[in-house]
Regions:
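A membrane-topology feature that recognizes alpha-helical transmembrane segments
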Residues: 1-245
């Protein structure tokens, strides 16, 4: 599952954020993104089915393309492993297999947004309906109820706050953040939106501090907030699961 969503994010980058975006029509791009068989990005050799096996496929190939022997990015098996660990953690905390599975689909789509924002400082808006669907489904399977008045109040508050922030401090926030932050806060729910917000910005500031060049000021340094919003949402869902024990 992790490799599917990682590949999805990378193909969106390739066909929407590179010169190829002008080569294909809207429908042609999505057809390629969803139906093109997995292949080596260097030589184009199609990946055999056995090599698509999570984690094991990477070991079978010894981390290299069998044809051109270029190294396969290590983030594929790492993310596959992390998704498996996440499933086990949520299942052990909640004993709810349907919730644990739906959370993986939710964070698969979160991963797509994290990839596009980290690479291009752009959030994939077409991803929003899927984020909302799997997020609401996960919360329903967890709480056995749909969003209530407090959840909508959290969403409304975040929308108002981020619109004001965007209007009066445009250089410090992007439109994608204005759209995605309220949605993530809505999915985190009350009171876990506090955990989502604080963890997102704490991690973002730490990243900015640690990644800055010598003598570079933090003020004005571009930060892929969508990436850290994704981590913050994961932390908030883990918080829910832990507190429900």
């Amino acid at each position: 599952m992790a490799s599917f969503y990682t590949t999805l994010g990378e193909r969106i980058l390739k066909y929407y954020y590179s010169p190829l975006r002008k080569k294909y029509s809207f429908f042609e791009k999505w057809k390629i993104i969803f139906t093109k068989p997995s292949a080596c990005e260097n030589c184009g050799t199609q990946v055999k089915a056995i090599y698509l096996t999570p984690i094991l496929g990477y070991l079978f190939t010894k981390g290299k393309c069998p044809s051109c022997e270029i190294k396969i990015a290590s983030h594929y098996p790492i993310l596959e492993f992390l998704f498996g660990i996440l499933f086990c953690i949520f299942l052990s905390l909640t004993n709810n297999i349907l919730f644990s599975l739906s959370v993986l689909f939710l964070f698969g789509h979160v991963l797509v947004s994290m990839i596009t924002d980290y690479k291009k400082f752009s959030l994939d808006y077409e991803n929003l309906p899927f984020l909302l669907f799997f997020g609401v489904l996960s919360n329903f399977l967890f709480y056995n109820q749909f969003p209530d008045f407090i959840d909508y109040a959290v969403f409304t508050g975040f929308v108002a706050f981020y619109i004001l922030l965007w209007v009066f401090y445009k250089k410090g926030i992007g439109l994608g953040d204005v759209i995605f932050a309220p949605v993530y806060a809505f999915l985190a729910g009350h009171p876990y939106w506090i955990l989502f917000l604080n963890s997102s910005y704490i991690l973002a500031v730490l990243w900015a501090f640690l990644s800055r060049k010598k003598g570079e000021k933090l003020d004005g340094k571009p930060i892929p907030m969508g990436f850290f919003f994704g981590i913050g949402l994961l932390i908030s869902f883990l918080g829910k699961a832990i507190m429900a024990r």
